[in-house]
Structure formats: structure tokens, C-alpha cells
Design a protein with these regions (language model features):
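A short, N-terminal "cap"/entry segment at the start of jelly-roll beta-barrel domains
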Residues: 1-52, 136-138
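Short beta-strand His + acidic residue motifs that chelate non-heme Fe in jelly-roll/DSBH
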Residues: 66-68, 86-87, 103, 109-115
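Conserved short histidine dyad/triad with adjacent acidic residue
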Residues: 39-41, 56-71
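Short acidic-glycine-tyrosine-enriched beta hairpin
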Residues: 91-105
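Ligand-binding loop in jelly-roll beta-barrel domains
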Residues: 105-131
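Short, conserved beta-strand element in jelly-roll/cupin
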Residues: 59-60, 71-86, 124
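Well-ordered beta-strand scaffold positions
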Residues: 53, 58, 91-93
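Structural motif
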Residues: 76, 83-85, 92, 108, ...
């Protein structure tokens, strides 16, 4: 075992890859895919965590998405393919490729792919909490 593996902290998000000392490049095409929010979302894809940031390349199948939830960390969503419809603190938006969506910490929000096509997005969160959020109670 290398000293890098021994010095590598555990990921906060189950199944995510944790960057360790001397690791600078990650091929998201080969990183294990995880659920973006197992209790409330269909988003899935590879996720890598550093000391202060978490990144993920997520996909939601056409017409599927996330139920209302929140998380104590803020989030950015960069739409790469498809259309991402979201409601953030009661305001509904529609983000197309090239759009960046900001979700403040603790904001109740949901998001989904339109029925016409899958949505693919690159997401970034601060690593204070992990990738997964808290489903809003019914």
C-alpha cells in the first residue's frame, strides 16, 4: 500500500472518490457512478471530493428528477445537455445548456429533466456536508 492511500481521508459521500495527496486528475468516465440523492432523486453519476469542494457529473433520465429537498451547503449546477427545470425557494426556472444555476445553502429546491430528453449537468458543492441532501417532509 502506498503512503498516498494510507493518508487519504474517507469520502463524506458514500461511494464517492476522495482525492488524496498527489492526486490531481480524475477521469469521470471511469469513476464509479453513485446516486445524487438516494432518498429523493434520480440523478446519478461520478462524484469526486476534495478537502473543500465536491464535484459530480450527473444525469437525470427524461421526465425524472428530484423531490423537494435542501442541504446545508450551497450548490452550483452547470447544464451541459438537455433542459433542467427547477424550483428554488418557490421560484421556477428552466436552464438550458450553458446555463449555471445557483442554489443557496438550506434553500428548499427540486429539479428535473424535461420529458423530451435526459439532462446532464456538472455540479459543485462545498464539502462541509457531502453530496446528499435532506428530503423535505411531506
Amino acid at each position: 500500500m502506498s503512503t498516498q492511500a494510507a493518508d487519504k481521508p474517507a469520502a463524506r459521500t458514500p461511494g464517492a472518490v476522495r482525492a488524496g495527496p498527489g492526486e490531481f486528475l480524475f477521469d469521470l468516465g471511469t469513476v464509479q457512478k453513485i446516486m445524487g440523492g438516494p432518498a429523493y432523486s434520480t440523478a446519478h453519476g461520478p462524484c469526486v471530493e476534495g478537502d473543500r469542494m465536491i464535484v459530480g457529473l450527473m444525469r437525470m433520465k427524461a421526465g425524472t428528477g428530484a423531490e423537494p429537498h435542501s442541504h446545508p451547503n450551497e450548490q452550483w449546477v452547470y447544464v451541459m445537455e438537455g433542459t433542467f427545470q427547477a424550483t428554488i425557494e418557490g421560484k421556477t426556472i428552466e436552464a438550458k445548456p450553458g446555463s449555471v444555476v445557483y442554489i443557496p445553502a438550506n434553500a428548499v429546491h427540486n429539479g428535473k429533466a424535461t420529458p423530451e430528453a435526459d439532462v446532464v449537468f456538472f455540479t459543485v458543492k462545498d464539502a462541509s456536508y457531502g453530496l446528499h441532501g435532506i428530503k423535505k417532509a411531506d
